[in-house]
UniProtKB/Swiss-Prot annotation:
Positions of transmembrane segments: none
PROSITE patterns: RIBOSOMAL_L18E
Organism annotation: Plutella xylostella (Diamondback moth)
Compartments reported by the entry: Cytoplasm
Protein name listed in UniProt: Large ribosomal subunit protein eL18
Recorded family membership: Belongs to the eukaryotic ribosomal protein eL18 family.
InterPro entries reported in the protein's UniProt record: Ribosomal_eL18, Ribosomal_eL18/eL18-A/B/_CS, Ribosomal_uL15/eL18, Ribosomal_uL15/eL18_sf
Gene Ontology process terms (BP): translation
Key words of the record: Cytoplasm, Ribonucleoprotein, Ribosomal protein
Matching SUPFAM superfamilies: Ribosomal proteins L15p and L18e (SSF52080)
Gene3D superfamilies to which the protein is assigned, alphabetical: 3.100.10.10
Length: 183
């Protein structure tokens, strides 16, 4: 008598194509799918995989974090590649000169990078400048920075759990029954 084999772990769960209907994103996917196939560079495969990702998995990156990553001495003259959005950070006083390639850059962040003498590339411009990803550095935003992530983990109240509970309101108000006014 044979055994019933459990096949629930057989498939690899990841996106194999972009879910968005955005034509510009789909054109980038076409371009990087071609580059990933024709060049033997790991960089293009990583960019392609990140282009497939959902918005949650392409978190925004602040200018201050980007500047902190790019001011390392080994990263001088490299192109920062962000498959996502670069946002402004008012806490950063002086923006260093840097070359950035990103899917989207907010208006204020764009102005500050360009004022510092920096350069902002689109991904199709990046493909022409660095088709194999030479002299580039891939940078991501924090995926666990979302407020929703605080609610994940062992149940709130469990030992050593720092999970935030889902609470409608704090205080004695929630214990009150809804009163009907006599009309």
């Amino acid at each position: 008598m044979g055994i019933d084999i459990n096949h629930k772990h057989d498939r690899k769960v990841r996106r194999t194509e972009v879910k968005s209907q955005d034509v510009y994103l789909r054109l980038l996917v076409k371009l990087y799918r071609y580059l990933a196939r024709r060049t033997n560079a790991k960089f293009n495969q990583i960019v392609l995989r990140r282009l497939f990702m959902s918005r949650i998995n392409r978190p925004p990156l602040s200018l201050s974090r980007l500047a902190r990553h790019m001011k390392k001495p080994t990263r001088e003259g490299l192109i920062a590649v962000v498959v996502g959005t670069i946002t402004n950070d008012t806490r950063l006083y002086k923006v260093p000169k840097m070359t950035v390639a990103a899917l989207h850059v907010t208006e204020k962040a764009r102005a500050r990078i360009l004022d510092a003498g920096g350069e902002i590339l689109t991904f199709d411009q990046l493909a022409l400048r660095a088709p194999t990803g030479r002299k580039t550095v891939l940078i991501q935003g924090q995926r666990n920075a979302r407020e929703a992530v605080r609610h994940f983990g062992p149940a709130p109240g469990a030992p050593r759990s720092h999970t935030k509970p889902y609470v409608r309101s704090k205080g004695h108000e929630q214990a009150k029954p809804s009163r009907r006014s006599n009309v």
